């Protein structure tokens, strides 16, 4: 389609959240147009770093809603999603004090042994088996971008950093680094960890919400051939998740390490304490000398105190601005649910602005 500088909705941020939101908007309202503005290549921000395990784990009622909506979205598009999302059996290591069934959406099977031969569970945990999927985030972003452009009402513009946003009675206007402007009836900011410090107004707004950035660590793991299997393990009590990469050729280990207030554009180095924790877990699970670190992924995401995503108007920037952020390292697996909720919020605002009840 020809360049549209005046769409109904502008989405700033071409990661999986922004692209999924654009696709949801176009699907929900066949009369709307949407333009996605991405400062780099699509999917090259925080979306490219996660290990990308799609597990049905939730902490709160909103979190559960987003998990269930996301899984339903994928199941409704099973033929398309098979290209970038594949199933992996998940064994949960459950400590005595954790009521896992209250935090996992689909049914679980107690007593069934899920870990492969040669793998070992930590002492004192129960093993519970469930479903999970691994995702190729880059392939998914490409598929979402194609869905947006194929609609005939959407476009994706790369290498277009947005540096300012203003609003008047007619709508919102964003200014790009190259001087171009785009205007729309509504703007969605899907900036991931770049939102809190995007400008002074978002900085104050984020501080009021308790929205902060935190470093997130992941390791690429090579495993001895005799121990390789299409299997994943999750240990909520230790906040560790181990699973094969979507394309094969290795495994991914994600683990928590609290380092707050991090600039997403600063150099990110692996922390020794993270390697030590990973070693303790993998030596137990696989055995010493049976695995090695083949690479690492260090990135940044935004978090709230409640570990709940924020999908809300940002009146610090204007009445026509909605923010989708605070994904606490789970943006890949929650993206469809976040997109659906964001799309409903945006379309409701547009209808209200046009005087529709």
Task: Identify the role of each PLM range.
Residues 23-24, 52-54, 83-87, 191-319:
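Active-site substrate-recognition segment that forms the wall
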Residues 26-47:
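Glycine-rich FAD pyrophosphate-binding loop
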Residues 82-92, 109-148, 256-262, 322-327:
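Helix-loop-beta segment of a Rossmann-like dinucleotide-binding subdomain
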């Amino acid at each position: 389609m020809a360049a549209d500088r005046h769409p109904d909705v502008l989405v700033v941020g071409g990661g999986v959240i922004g692209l999924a939101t654009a696709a949801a908007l176009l699907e929900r309202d066949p009369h709307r147009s949407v333009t996605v503005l991405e400062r780099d290549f699509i999917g090259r921000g925080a979306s490219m770093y996660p290990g990308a395990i799609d597990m049905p784990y939730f902490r709160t009622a909103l979190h559960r809603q987003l998990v269930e909506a996301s899984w339903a979205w994928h199941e409704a598009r099973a033929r398309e999603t098979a290209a970038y999302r594949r199933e992996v059996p998940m064994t949960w290591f459950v400590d005595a004090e954790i009521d896992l069934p209250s935090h996992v959406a689909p049914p679980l099977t107690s007593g069934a042994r899920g870990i492969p031969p040669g793998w070992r569970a930590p002492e004192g945990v129960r093993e519970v088996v469930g479903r999970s999927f691994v995702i190729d985030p880059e392939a998914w972003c490409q598929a979402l971008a194609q869905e947006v452009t194929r609609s005939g009402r959407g476009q994706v513009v790369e290498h277009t950093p947005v540096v300012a946003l203003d609003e008047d009675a007619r709508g919102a206007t964003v200014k790009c680094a190259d001087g171009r402007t785009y205007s729309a009836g509504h703007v969605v900011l899907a900036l991931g960890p770049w939102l809190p410090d995007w400008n002074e107004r978002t900085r104050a707004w984020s501080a009021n919400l308790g929205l902060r950035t935190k470093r997130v660590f992941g390791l690429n793991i090579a495993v001895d051939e005799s121990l390789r299997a299409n299997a994943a393990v999750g240990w909520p009590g230790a906040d560790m998740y181990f699973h094969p990469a979507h394309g094969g050729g290795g495994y991914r280990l994600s683990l928590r390490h609290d380092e707050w207030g991090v600039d997403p554009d600063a150099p990110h180095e692996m922390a020794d304490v993270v390697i030590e924790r990973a070693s303790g877990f993998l030596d137990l699970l696989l055995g010493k000398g049976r695995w090695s670190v083949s690479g690492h992924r260090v990135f940044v995401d935004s978090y709230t105190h409640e570990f709940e995503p924020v999908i809300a108007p940002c009146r610090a920037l204007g009445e026509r601005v909605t923010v989708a952020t605070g994904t606490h390292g789970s943006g890949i697996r929650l993206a469809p649910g976040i997109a659906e909720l964001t799309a409903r919020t945006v379309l409701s605002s547009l209808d209200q602005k046009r005087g529709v009840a």
